[in-house]
Curated annotation (Swiss-Prot):
Annotated site (Stabilizes the basic form of H active site to accept a proton): 113
Oligomeric and partner information: Monomer.
Location relative to the cell: Cytoplasm
UniProt organism field: Bordetella parapertussis (strain 12822 / ATCC BAA-587 / NCTC 13253)
S-S bonds: none
Stated name of the protein: Peptidyl-tRNA hydrolase
Pfam families hit by this protein: Pept_tRNA_hydro (PF01195)
Record-marked site positions (Discriminates between blocked and unblocked aminoacyl-tRNA): 30
Gene giving rise to this polypeptide: pth
Family: Belongs to the PTH family.
Catalysis performed (reactions): an N-acyl-L-alpha-aminoacyl-tRNA + H2O = an N-acyl-L-amino acid + a tRNA + H(+)
NCBIfam families named in the record: pth
Classification lineage: Bacteria, Pseudomonadati, Pseudomonadota, Betaproteobacteria, Burkholderiales
Length: 215
Protein backbone atom coordinates (compact mmCIF):
# COMPACT_ATOMS: atom_id res chain seq x y z
CA UNK A 1 0.00 0.00 0.00
CA UNK A 2 1.21 3.51 -0.73
CA UNK A 3 2.77 5.32 2.22
CA UNK A 4 1.11 8.72 2.00
CA UNK A 5 0.65 11.32 4.72
CA UNK A 6 -2.76 12.84 4.08
CA UNK A 7 -2.96 15.18 7.05
CA UNK A 8 0.05 17.44 6.61
CA UNK A 9 -1.54 20.38 4.77
CA UNK A 10 -5.04 20.42 6.20
CA UNK A 11 -6.28 23.82 7.40
CA UNK A 12 -8.94 24.24 10.13
CA UNK A 13 -11.09 26.30 7.72
CA UNK A 14 -10.84 23.80 4.86
CA UNK A 15 -14.25 22.25 5.47
CA UNK A 16 -17.75 23.44 6.30
CA UNK A 17 -18.74 21.70 9.53
CA UNK A 18 -22.12 20.02 9.09
CA UNK A 19 -22.03 17.42 11.86
CA UNK A 20 -20.26 16.96 15.18
CA UNK A 21 -16.52 16.67 14.55
CA UNK A 22 -15.14 13.18 15.16
CA UNK A 23 -13.03 12.88 18.31
CA UNK A 24 -12.72 9.08 18.61
CA UNK A 25 -11.81 6.78 15.72
CA UNK A 26 -12.21 3.06 16.45
CA UNK A 27 -10.71 0.37 14.24
CA UNK A 28 -12.34 -3.02 14.74
CA UNK A 29 -10.52 -6.33 14.56
CA UNK A 30 -9.14 -9.20 16.58
CA UNK A 31 -5.79 -8.95 18.40
CA UNK A 32 -2.79 -11.15 17.80
CA UNK A 33 -0.75 -12.45 14.85
CA UNK A 34 -3.22 -15.23 14.03
CA UNK A 35 -5.80 -12.63 12.97
CA UNK A 36 -3.59 -9.85 11.66
CA UNK A 37 -4.16 -10.50 7.94
CA UNK A 38 -7.79 -11.67 8.11
CA UNK A 39 -10.72 -9.86 6.51
CA UNK A 40 -12.29 -9.14 9.89
CA UNK A 41 -9.28 -6.92 10.70
CA UNK A 42 -9.86 -4.38 7.93
CA UNK A 43 -10.71 -1.76 10.57
CA UNK A 44 -7.36 -2.35 12.28
CA UNK A 45 -5.56 -1.92 8.93
CA UNK A 46 -7.07 1.49 8.33
CA UNK A 47 -6.56 2.59 11.95
CA UNK A 48 -2.85 1.76 11.70
CA UNK A 49 -2.47 3.96 8.61
CA UNK A 50 -4.40 6.80 10.22
CA UNK A 51 -2.03 6.68 13.19
CA UNK A 52 0.86 7.07 10.73
CA UNK A 53 -0.91 9.94 8.98
CA UNK A 54 -1.52 11.71 12.28
CA UNK A 55 2.10 11.10 13.34
CA UNK A 56 1.19 9.10 16.42
CA UNK A 57 1.54 5.50 17.59
CA UNK A 58 -0.60 2.97 19.43
CA UNK A 59 0.25 1.94 22.98
CA UNK A 60 -1.47 -0.53 25.26
CA UNK A 61 -3.92 1.04 27.74
CA UNK A 62 -5.19 -1.80 29.93
CA UNK A 63 -7.77 0.41 31.61
CA UNK A 64 -9.37 0.98 28.22
CA UNK A 65 -9.05 -2.66 27.11
CA UNK A 66 -7.27 -1.59 23.95
CA UNK A 67 -4.44 0.04 22.06
CA UNK A 68 -4.73 3.84 22.18
CA UNK A 69 -3.11 6.58 20.10
CA UNK A 70 -3.53 10.29 20.80
CA UNK A 71 -3.06 13.08 18.28
CA UNK A 72 -3.83 16.71 17.53
CA UNK A 73 -5.51 17.74 14.30
CA UNK A 74 -6.56 21.27 13.36
CA UNK A 75 -6.09 22.31 16.98
CA UNK A 76 -8.31 19.56 18.41
CA UNK A 77 -7.60 16.33 20.28
CA UNK A 78 -8.25 13.09 18.43
CA UNK A 79 -8.09 9.59 19.93
CA UNK A 80 -7.60 6.40 17.93
CA UNK A 81 -8.54 3.06 19.46
CA UNK A 82 -8.04 -0.60 18.60
CA UNK A 83 -9.92 -2.78 21.12
CA UNK A 84 -8.06 -5.90 22.24
CA UNK A 85 -11.19 -7.55 23.63
CA UNK A 86 -11.80 -9.55 20.44
CA UNK A 87 -14.47 -8.42 18.04
CA UNK A 88 -17.56 -9.54 19.93
CA UNK A 89 -16.63 -7.53 23.05
CA UNK A 90 -15.52 -4.32 21.31
CA UNK A 91 -18.08 -2.28 23.21
CA UNK A 92 -16.25 -2.84 26.51
CA UNK A 93 -13.30 -0.87 25.15
CA UNK A 94 -15.22 1.74 23.15
CA UNK A 95 -17.58 2.46 26.03
CA UNK A 96 -14.71 2.93 28.47
CA UNK A 97 -12.94 5.44 26.21
CA UNK A 98 -16.10 7.32 25.31
CA UNK A 99 -17.05 7.70 28.97
CA UNK A 100 -13.57 8.84 30.00
CA UNK A 101 -13.42 11.54 27.32
CA UNK A 102 -17.14 12.41 27.73
CA UNK A 103 -17.89 11.82 24.06
CA UNK A 104 -21.33 11.58 22.50
CA UNK A 105 -22.00 8.70 20.08
CA UNK A 106 -22.11 11.26 17.26
CA UNK A 107 -18.42 12.02 17.90
CA UNK A 108 -17.37 8.40 17.38
CA UNK A 109 -16.34 6.88 14.03
CA UNK A 110 -16.04 3.09 13.78
CA UNK A 111 -13.98 1.51 10.99
CA UNK A 112 -15.12 -2.02 10.17
CA UNK A 113 -15.31 -4.75 7.55
CA UNK A 114 -18.58 -5.00 5.62
CA UNK A 115 -19.92 -8.20 4.06
CA UNK A 116 -22.61 -6.40 2.07
CA UNK A 117 -20.07 -4.40 0.04
CA UNK A 118 -17.68 -5.87 -2.50
CA UNK A 119 -13.92 -5.44 -2.13
CA UNK A 120 -13.14 -2.04 -3.62
CA UNK A 121 -16.30 -0.44 -2.23
CA UNK A 122 -16.78 1.64 0.91
CA UNK A 123 -19.67 3.54 2.45
CA UNK A 124 -20.22 5.99 5.29
CA UNK A 125 -23.25 5.59 7.49
CA UNK A 126 -24.58 7.04 10.72
CA UNK A 127 -26.91 5.08 12.94
CA UNK A 128 -29.08 2.16 11.91
CA UNK A 129 -28.75 -1.48 12.82
CA UNK A 130 -25.71 -3.70 13.13
CA UNK A 131 -26.63 -6.13 10.30
CA UNK A 132 -25.33 -9.07 12.32
CA UNK A 133 -21.88 -7.53 12.89
CA UNK A 134 -21.19 -8.49 16.49
CA UNK A 135 -18.62 -5.75 17.02
CA UNK A 136 -21.12 -3.07 16.04
CA UNK A 137 -23.82 -4.75 18.12
CA UNK A 138 -21.66 -4.63 21.24
CA UNK A 139 -20.63 -1.01 20.64
CA UNK A 140 -24.25 0.03 20.21
CA UNK A 141 -25.11 -1.61 23.54
CA UNK A 142 -22.14 0.00 25.30
CA UNK A 143 -22.88 3.50 24.00
CA UNK A 144 -26.61 3.13 24.56
CA UNK A 145 -27.24 4.47 21.07
CA UNK A 146 -26.81 3.46 17.41
CA UNK A 147 -25.98 7.04 16.39
CA UNK A 148 -22.23 6.63 15.99
CA UNK A 149 -20.69 6.89 12.52
CA UNK A 150 -19.49 3.84 10.60
CA UNK A 151 -16.96 3.60 7.79
CA UNK A 152 -17.89 0.32 6.11
CA UNK A 153 -14.97 -1.28 4.25
CA UNK A 154 -16.18 -3.83 1.71
CA UNK A 155 -14.77 -7.35 1.99
CA UNK A 156 -17.51 -9.09 0.02
CA UNK A 157 -19.68 -12.05 0.99
CA UNK A 158 -18.76 -15.67 0.23
CA UNK A 159 -21.80 -15.96 -2.05
CA UNK A 160 -21.06 -12.75 -3.96
CA UNK A 161 -17.46 -13.91 -4.47
CA UNK A 162 -18.39 -17.43 -5.57
CA UNK A 163 -17.00 -19.12 -2.47
CA UNK A 164 -18.48 -22.03 -0.53
CA UNK A 165 -17.17 -20.86 2.87
CA UNK A 166 -19.42 -20.10 5.80
CA UNK A 167 -19.35 -16.42 6.81
CA UNK A 168 -17.70 -17.16 10.18
CA UNK A 169 -14.85 -18.92 8.38
CA UNK A 170 -14.65 -16.38 5.54
CA UNK A 171 -14.05 -13.35 7.76
CA UNK A 172 -11.25 -15.15 9.63
CA UNK A 173 -9.22 -15.81 6.48
CA UNK A 174 -7.05 -13.40 4.47
CA UNK A 175 -8.49 -11.89 1.28
CA UNK A 176 -7.31 -13.29 -2.02
CA UNK A 177 -4.59 -11.25 -3.75
CA UNK A 178 -6.90 -9.27 -6.04
CA UNK A 179 -9.32 -8.61 -3.19
CA UNK A 180 -6.49 -7.39 -0.96
CA UNK A 181 -5.37 -4.96 -3.65
CA UNK A 182 -8.93 -3.62 -3.92
CA UNK A 183 -9.22 -3.24 -0.15
CA UNK A 184 -5.85 -1.48 -0.01
CA UNK A 185 -7.06 1.00 -2.63
CA UNK A 186 -10.20 1.66 -0.58
CA UNK A 187 -8.11 2.24 2.54
CA UNK A 188 -6.10 4.89 0.70
CA UNK A 189 -9.35 6.55 -0.40
CA UNK A 190 -10.57 6.54 3.20
CA UNK A 191 -7.35 8.10 4.43
CA UNK A 192 -7.84 10.98 2.02
CA UNK A 193 -11.28 11.92 3.42
CA UNK A 194 -10.77 11.31 7.15
CA UNK A 195 -9.69 14.97 7.64
CA UNK A 196 -13.14 16.00 6.40
CA UNK A 197 -14.79 13.66 8.90
CA UNK A 198 -12.64 15.01 11.72
CA UNK A 199 -13.98 18.44 10.78
CA UNK A 200 -17.57 17.16 10.70
CA UNK A 201 -18.01 17.52 6.94
CA UNK A 202 -19.56 14.14 6.24
CA UNK A 203 -21.29 15.48 3.15
CA UNK A 204 -17.92 15.99 1.48
CA UNK A 205 -16.53 12.68 2.72
CA UNK A 206 -19.62 10.80 1.52
CA UNK A 207 -19.55 12.47 -1.88
CA UNK A 208 -15.88 11.64 -2.39
CA UNK A 209 -16.07 8.03 -1.21
CA UNK A 210 -19.42 6.95 -2.62
CA UNK A 211 -18.77 8.63 -5.95
CA UNK A 212 -15.68 6.49 -6.51
CA UNK A 213 -17.32 3.14 -5.70
CA UNK A 214 -18.10 2.41 -9.32
CA UNK A 215 -21.16 0.35 -8.46
Amino acid sequence: MRRVLYFTNTRPDAYATMSDPIRLIVGLGNPGPDYETTRHNAGFWLADHLADDLRTAFALEKGFFGMLAKARHAGENVVLLKPITYMNRSGQSVGAVARFYKLAPEQVLVLHDELDLLPGQVKIKQGGGHAGHNGLKDIQAALGSPNFWRLRIGIGHPRSLGLAQQVADFVLHPPRREEQQQIDTVIDRCRAVVPAMLAGDFALATRELHGANGA
